[in-house]
Swiss-Prot record:
The lineage of its organism: Eukaryota, Fungi, Dikarya, Ascomycota, Saccharomycotina. FMN binds at residues 16-21, 64-67, 102-111, 137. NADPH-dependent reductase which is a central component of the cytosolic iron-sulfur (Fe-S) protein assembly (CIA) machinery. Transfers electrons from NADPH via its FAD and FMN prosthetic groups to the [2Fe-2S] cluster of DRE2, another key component of the CIA machinery. In turn, this reduced cluster provides electrons for assembly of cytosolic iron-sulfur cluster proteins. Positively controls H(2)O(2)-induced cell death. The gene is TAH18. InterPro entries: CysJ-like_FAD-binding, FAD-bd_FR_type, Flavdoxin-like, Flavodoxin/NO_synth, Flavoprot_Pyr_Nucl_cyt_Rdtase, Flavoprotein-like_sf, FNR_nucleotide-bd, NADPH_Cyt_P450_Rdtase_alpha. Its main location: cytoplasm. This is NADPH-dependent diflavin oxidoreductase 1. It catalyses: 2 oxidized [2Fe-2S]-[protein] + NADPH = 2 reduced [2Fe-2S]-[protein] + NADP(+) + H(+). Residues 10-155 form the Flavodoxin-like domain. Interacts with DRE2; as part of the cytosolic iron-sulfur (Fe-S) protein assembly (CIA) machinery. It comes from Debaryomyces hansenii (strain ATCC 36239 / CBS 767 / BCRC 21394 / JCM 1990 / NBRC 0083 / IGC 2968) (Yeast). NADP(+) binds at T465, S521, R522. Residues 209-451 form the FAD-binding FR-type domain.
Length: 603
């Protein structure tokens, strides 16, 4: 492996569900480039695995942990490959490795993903470049505090290994674009016009993805008119669909025309070229769901379908944007310094207060600094993040011809008193009957399978739209005529306003197919406010189901307080009903997790 270049032999791989790990990877890559290195940076699943053997000398893996110790979706293929038993134990003995994990210590399997990856890579022969770091989102210093120390150690290790790395770097130097974009000078390349909807469908030409084409059958509000939350029951028709309860459906949203036009107008030099064809040089960034037809790619269509201009700007965004502020004026120099400040790890509080706390968008950031900003088209793929697909739990029993979703439309006011609308849910709300859409179906991490002989009870816990996979499971089991006891603990605000599918639950209850335990947190006459309280109210039933009847527990909903409180409540019930100590009860739940009897899907 002596032929591997020291400078280009650095590979940064990331596994990221929400974008945090990806941004740390991009930030680190830019830092290393300033030191003269030429790192590759890509998700774990999209790195050509043969390159680990041929092109990699120093391997850096940054990965978050999701759910119950799961790897992010874009790292599962990589893990499956490196776990192959036939791989020789000296396969990667030419590689020096370090890893950085992002996790939440309130979850039982804290940083489980990076531990598994790190351990397996060492088994395949990697040696350690510097010590693995496991960042904890729950600590006061947050992930940034861990990252700063780990990056310092990493840079020191690389400087000691690679000859000629400078001790410092000049952050004012603009590095060449990784994915340069230019406007085609060939007038014959001008694309024919397409409506945004029809243009989105050209993704279907990408044979590397499992895309499906469907049409909207219904898009109905199912919360009461006047209730603050608009929840949609979206029904999509398709062909040859294959899914089971627990699977998710990915949608590929687009930016609205008004936001796209606002961004273009903020950069006057973009206006005359907005609808001219683009040429992308070098490797095209990976776009999950496929790039729209490249022959129809213009600046406007690229922004509309692929550039995420509504998300909160991350550190790597500011690191690049600062270069495009005109520092020849006093205002411009001051603004450039402010943008650079937001890109520094040690100024994470400033970044949080400017971007995260008020949930300021990329578009708003550009508008705020636009007087002194001139963004070259060449750098747009280096500057803007790519729109990620949005995943929703499927809410219908398996059908080859249709699939249902329950979607809460995201609308809220920030501390700046500005109205925010979620990119995807705003798009979903606009969908009309018979609109054609592209989607894909993803298999569940839960590994939920119905037994073939004995059917243990299933205890389901879900507030709000978390009831989607429960509805899928309940309808599936009842349609098969299986005699299986189903218990649903469901929480919402009001019985009259947002008790989703209340009529369905009542009908199934009357047929003795479902035991339903609803609670309504905002109803005046409701003594039981939240699902964990309702569960404890039924502690004898729940204790008997878990300890005597081997019930499966299935929890779905928002991450954070709810799953933690439900787990604490179950520990209390096991202590009371099963006469256990707290450590014994906690171990019992852990055994249930490992045995597939305690399933949790949160976001």
């Amino acid at each position: 492996m002596s032929g591997i270049s020291e400078l280009s032999g650095v590979t940064i791989l990331y596994g990221s569900e929400t974008g945090n790990a990806q941004d740390y990877a991009l930030f680190l890559a830019k830092r290393l480039k300033y030191f003269g290195l030429k790192p590759s940076v890509v998700s774990l699943d999209h790195y050509p695995l043969k390159n680990l053997v041929t092109d990699t000398k120093y391997l850096i893996v940054i990965c978050s942990t999701t759910g119950q110790g799961e790897l992010p979706r874009n790292s599962k293929k990589f893990m499956k490959f490196i776990l192959k038993k036939k791989l020789p134990t000296d396969l990667l003995n030419h590689i020096e490795l370090t890893t950085f994990g992002i996790g939440d210590s309130s979850y039982p399997k804290f940083n489980y993903a990076i531990k598994k990856i790190h351990a397996r890579l060492l088994q395949l022969g990697c040696s350690e470049l510097c010590t693995r770091c496991e960042a904890d989102e729950q600590t006061p210093e947050g992930v940034d505090g861990y990252y700063s120390e780990w990056e310092t150690n990493l840079l020191e290790a690389l400087k000691s290994k690679i000859h000629g790395i400078p001790l410092t770097y000049d952050e004012t130097v603009l590095l060449p674009a990784d994915n340069p974009v230019e406007v085609s000078s060939n007038e014959s390349d001008v694309p024919t016009s397409n409506s945004p909807t029809e243009l989105s469908l050209t993704r279907m030409g990408d044979g590397s993805t499992n895309l499906l084409l469907g049409s909207v059958k219904a898009n109905k509000r199912i919360t009461k008119e006047g209730h603050f939350q608009d929840v949609r029951h979206l029904i999509i028709e398709g062909e040859n669909l294959s899914y089971i309860p627990g699977d998710t459906l990915a949608l590929y949203p687009s930016n609205d025309n008004e936001s796209v036009e606002t961004l273009i107008q903020s950069q006057p030099h973009w206006i005359p070229i907005a609808d001219k064809p683009l040429l992308i040089h070098g490797e095209i960034p990976f776009v999950e769901g496929g790039l729209i037809d490249k022959s129809k790619l213009t600046l406007r269509s690229l922004i509309t379908h692929h550039l995420d201009i509504i998300s909160i700007p991350r550190r790597s965004f500011f690191m690049t944007l600062a270069h495009f502020s005109d520092s020849t004026t006093e205002d411009g120099e001051r603004e450039q310094e402010k943008l650079r400040e937001f890109s520094k790890i040690e100024e994470s509080e400033e970044l949080y207060n400017y971007a995260n706390r008020p949930r300021r968008s990329i578009l708003e950031t550009i508008l705020e600094f636009q007087q002194n900003l001139t963004i070259p088209v060449e750098y747009i793929l280096d500057l803007f993040p790519i729109i990620k697909p949005r995943l929703f739990s499927i809410a219908s029993r398996p059908s080859p011809n249709s699939v249902e979703l329950i979607v809460a439309v995201v609308v809220y006011k920030t501390i700046l008193r500005r109205v925010r609308r979620g990119l995807c849910t705003k798009w979903i709300k606009s969908l009309q009957d018979n609109d054609r859409i592209v989607f894909s179906i993803h298999k569940s991490n839960l590994k939920f399978e119905l037994p073939t002989t004995k059917y243990p009870p299933i205890l389901m816990v879900s507030p709000g739209t978390g009831v989607a996979p429960m509805k899928s499971l309940i309808e599936h089991i009842t349609s098969l005529g299986i005699q299986q006891h189903l218990y649903l603990f469901y929480g919402c605000r009001n019985k009259e306003n947002d008790y989703l599918f209340g009529d369905l639950w009542a009908s199934l209850k009357s047929q003795n197919k479902l035991s339903i335990y609803p609670c309504f947190s905002r109803d005046q006459d409701s003594k039981i406010k939240y699902v964990q309280h309702k569960i404890y109210e039924q502690h004898e039933l729940v204790g008997d189901l878990i300890l005597n009847q081997n019930a499966i527990v299935f929890i779905c909903g928002s991450s954070g307080a709810m799953p933690r409180e439900v787990r604490i409540t179950l520990v209390e019930i096991l202590m009371k009903f099963g006469k256990m100590k707290d450590t014994e009860a906690d171990d019992y739940l852990m055994d249930m997790e490992n045995g597939g009897r305690y399933l949790q899907e949160t976001w």
